Curated annotation (Swiss-Prot):
An individual GO BP term: photosynthesis
GO cellular component: chloroplast thylakoid membrane
Main location: plastid
A Pfam family of this chain: PsbN
Assigned protein family: Belongs to the PsbN family.
Keywords, ordered alphabetically: Chloroplast, Membrane, Plastid, Thylakoid, Transmembrane, Transmembrane helix
Record's function text: May play a role in photosystem I and II biogenesis.
The keyword Cell cycle appears for this protein: no
Membrane topology: Single-pass membrane protein
TM annotation in the entry: 6-26
Protein name: Protein PsbN
Subcellular location: Plastid, Chloroplast thylakoid membrane
């Protein structure tokens, strides 16, 4: 019983780290060049 809780914790930790890493890659990596900036589109 204690062993399965440990593996669930490790799985959730790895999932959190991978989602965070992917978000940083999309936000600041090479794919960020394709993102649009709504503030630059509507400048007065």
């Amino acid at each position: 019983m204690e062993n399965s809780a440990f593996f669930y914790g490790v799985f959730l930790w790895c999932l959190l780290i991978s989602v965070t890493g992917y978000s940083i890659y999309i936000g600041f990596g090479p794919p960020s060049k394709e993102l649009r900036d709504p503030f630059e589109e509507h400048e007065d």
